[in-house]
Amino acid sequence: MSPKVTITHLSDLTPPSQERTWLTAPHPTLPLVATCSSDKTIRVYSLTNFTLLSTITGGHKRSVRTAAWKPHMTGESVLATGSFDATVGIWRRWDSYGQEGDAGMGMSSGDKQIPTDISTAASNGTGTDTADREEDEEEWRFAVLLDGHDSEVKSVSWSASGMLLATCSRDKSIWIWEDLDDGDNNFETVAVMQEHGGDVKCVSWHPSEECLASGSYDDTIRLWREDLDDWGQVACIKGHGGTVWFLDWEGEETEGNWSGPVADSVSESALSALQAQWRSQRALSGPRLLSCSDDRTVRVWRRQPKESQQTGPLSSATTGIPSIIRPTGTDEVWEEDAVLPRAHELPVYAVAWSKRTGLVASTGADGRIALYEERFVTREQEQEQQADSDAMDTTSGDVLRTEWVLVGVQDGAHGIYEINHVAWAKRADRRPGGEEEVLVSTADDGSVKVWTLTR
């Protein structure tokens, strides 16, 4: 069996918030993270030196619960934030303000660190015009307030294209907003879905399709798509025995460096062949969905390929001709692909699926961080696996069999405090050793910690 993964504390993000922190969102391209705090602020930290760069204030009247960076932005960063005050804020900031290289957004240029706290006037220019311009360009601009929810906003998520923003709330609703991208920060409400029977805890967009997943206090996961200009539910997954706290998607094949599951005692060429076959089979279903719950489990879900649902005499599977009108309607069948090894004694609040390594991280109320790895099950291992309590295999029928193995655990990662969120981020401190990625955990005591992984 492959060596276990050691989780090592690299640094805290300093200074921490003095109140509970809920979530830390890594920037998609820059070495930055945005941390949501109960003190009504969003704190932007550098992953280069682990220090505070900006404190975004003044937009929300209650705790900031969630945040997400808009993808595919050039020269400007856009951050969506959701608050217990029932509103969603959109913030903008130029990535560079007259500096070259990676000095923008507070990144160091040589040994010089550029101050970026919006509460401090940065007027270091030689003239008044220059100072005013730099101060204006440095600051986060509160672009627009999206108002529609009746209660606390729990999660926000941008679609892969960056044109759609999904928000969900304690009011049991999911809203989808379209960024009109007209230069005036205008957003249009395109859908309001209210099928959930309880507080909607999380929303997460498919990595390439306009398909939205949501998890709720009603113990279900629901999938949503647009059909003929109307958004509607296409699947309802009833597998968890408690509140679904968080969702994350598996990465696309083009993302990161992950080739697929690993295998023990197999040559590189044999492993490559297995991975190629596995990717070919997986392409029929698309990326899988990861969930965690109050029932203390972490689960993986797989969409049943449309071909297997379309078995009628005129289906594309029998005629070879793609059908524009789907004979089975818009409904999708999602099935449980795996239940990961039980690693938590209390509710699991967050999961994160690495797009670079394929590792899964989970955390929650027990203050523990757990790591899981997916591995191929060889013929020689199948008999042994039946009695292996540390591994749980997928139920994927005719496809290559895999198992998820618990490979790393960090107990008491934030002392006695509950951990609310965990995320993968690209390592940026440029120090040798360790993996290319770090884990970022966010806890009740206001601390945010960065962890490295070694085998």
UniProtKB/Swiss-Prot annotation:
WD repeat start and end residues: 8-55, 59-101, 148-187, 195-234, 266-311, 343-382, 413-455
Top-level taxon in the UniProt lineage: Eukaryota
Organism name: Penicillium rubens (strain ATCC 28089 / DSM 1075 / NRRL 1951 / Wisconsin 54-1255) (Penicillium chrysogenum)
Keyword Repeat: yes
Similarity-based family: Belongs to the WD repeat CIA1 family.
SMART domains: WD40 (SM00320)
Pfam (any one): WD40
Gene name of the encoded protein: cia1
Region annotation Disordered: where it falls in the sequence: 103-136, 302-326
GO biological process: iron-sulfur cluster assembly
GO annotations of cellular component type: cytosolic [4Fe-4S] assembly targeting complex
Record key words, sorted: Repeat, WD repeat
InterPro entries from the UniProt entry: CIAO1/Cia1 (IPR028608), G-protein_beta_WD-40_rep (IPR020472), WD40/YVTN_repeat-like_dom_sf (IPR015943), WD40_repeat_dom_sf (IPR036322), WD40_rpt (IPR001680)
Task of the protein: Essential component of the cytosolic iron-sulfur (Fe/S) protein assembly machinery. Required for the maturation of extramitochondrial Fe/S proteins.
Protein's name according to its UniProt entry: Probable cytosolic iron-sulfur protein assembly protein 1
UniProt cross-references to PROSITE patterns, sorted A to Z: WD_REPEATS_2, WD_REPEATS_REGION
Compositionally biased region (Polar residues): 116-125, 307-321
SUPFAM superfamilies: WD40 repeat-like (SSF50978)
